[in-house]
């Protein structure tokens, strides 16, 4: 998040479902930026889907909201485990292929640990991807 805020004048919206609100607010407080807000009071799936459809970009793990965003052809950045059954090759979203960027941890015994993905290395790809998406106007 801090990497994106240092490169772009943008709003970051942290979404939180049931039971996730406290963690989202803790993260927002840790970042301490007026450009970061928490959206945790939606009125269900339809309301949440409307917010995703309005997004300029959606970043998440390989979860339902990532795939729902892609159904609106919103540019997506996904973080996936590196096991054969979980890789982006199998679970890539359905948005246009040039509108998705995927990251996995290194192969090995900790291939399910998304914390092993280097954010600094990922930003090397993320920043130009975001720039390209926003210049193209999605």
Model feature map: region roles:
Residues 38, 67-135:
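Nucleotide-sugar donor-binding patch of glycosyltransferase catalytic domains
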Residues 22, 133-138:
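Mid-sequence helix-capping/hinge segment at a functional interface
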Residues 1-77, 81:
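Donor-binding and catalytic core of enzymes assembling or modifying cell-surface/extracellular glycoconjugates
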């Amino acid at each position: 998040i801090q990497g994106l805020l240092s490169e772009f004048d943008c709003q970051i919206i942290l979404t939180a479902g049931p039971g996730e609100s406290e963690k989202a607010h803790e993260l927002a407080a840790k970042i301490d930026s007026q450009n970061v807000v928490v959206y945790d009071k939606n009125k269900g799936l339809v309301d949440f889907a409307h917010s995703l459809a309005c997004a300029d970009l959606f970043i998440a793990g390989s979860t339902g909201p990532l795939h729902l965003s892609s159904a609106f052809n919103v540019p997506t950045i996904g973080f996936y485990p590196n096991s054969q059954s979980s890789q982006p090759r199998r679970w890539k979203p359905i948005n246009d292929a040039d509108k998705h960027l995927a990251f996995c941890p290194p192969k090995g015994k900790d291939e399910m640990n998304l914390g092993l993905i280097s954010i600094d290395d990922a930003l090397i790809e993320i920043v130009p991807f975001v720039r390209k998406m926003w210049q193209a106007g999605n």
